[in-house]
């Protein structure tokens, strides 16, 4: 997921970069990646594979995302698994990913930065963003996002230059907590409840993802 400083670079650029289709393959609850990284990513057997998308994000990064969900019979999403492979294009040699989260976790011997947040469905979305792409993919397959969600973002940097990353975002419907995104955000009347919800969410996310 690109940082805001990197996104600003695109406005002075007329670069057009082409991509082919997705490189990684998904079978059931498993993604197999032959490179960057060479890995097998396993999710719970209860997930449904929604599909994949690949495009050049803001003209500067080759992105390939795969979406999985756990949903009710009416296709209301209860849990979202968003797996994304991302690298800056060669035409932008000075760009690199920057993460400063003090929290880390290990999955399959890989070190991941850990961030969490809550989000309401009605919040504004950046045009052309990876979120716009994944939500369009979900809608096209008939799935509905919850009114409020909580997310864990796990990011593993693949190279010393910090130009390539594996990002896994796990999201859950907030409804079972009894709180809304606005209530749990800083300044909200239930923000003091967020630390425990946050810790439990990270634990669940870490337990649902296996990398070999």
Task: For each feature predicted by the language model, list its residue ranges.
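N-terminal targeting sequences that direct proteins away from the cytosol to non-cytosolic compartments
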Residues: 11, 15-67, 71-72, 161, ...
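Generic serine detector
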Residues: 5, 13-14, 20, 33, ...
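Sec-dependent signal peptide recognition
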Residues: 1-9
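Conserved polar/disulfide-associated segments of primarily extracytoplasmic proteins
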Residues: 55-189
């Amino acid at each position: 997921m690109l940082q805001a400083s990197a996104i600003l670079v695109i406005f002075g650029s007329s670069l057009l970069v082409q991509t082919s289709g997705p490189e990684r393959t998904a079978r059931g609850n498993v993604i197999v990646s032959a490179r960057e990284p060479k890995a097998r990513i396993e999710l719970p057997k209860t997930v449904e594979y929604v599909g994949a998308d690949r495009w050049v994000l803001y003209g500067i990064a080759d992105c390939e995302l795969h979406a999985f969900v756990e949903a009710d019979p009416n296709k209301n999403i209860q849990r979202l698994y968003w797996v994304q492979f991302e690298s800056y294009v060669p035409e932008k040699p000075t760009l690199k990913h920057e993460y400063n989260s003090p929290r880390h976790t290990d999955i399959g011997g890989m070190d991941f930065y850990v961030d969490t947040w809550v989000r309401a469905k009605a919040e504004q979305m950046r045009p052309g963003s990876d979120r716009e792409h994944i939500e369009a993919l979900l809608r096209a397959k008939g799935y509905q996002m919850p009114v409020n969600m909580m997310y864990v973002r796990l990011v593993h940097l693949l190279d010393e230059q910090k130009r390539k990353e594996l990002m896994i975002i796990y999201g859950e419907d907030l409804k079972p907590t009894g709180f809304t995104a606005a209530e749990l955000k800083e300044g909200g009347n239930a923000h003091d409840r967020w630390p425990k919800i946050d810790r439990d969410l990270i634990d669940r996310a870490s337990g649902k993802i296996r990398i070999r």
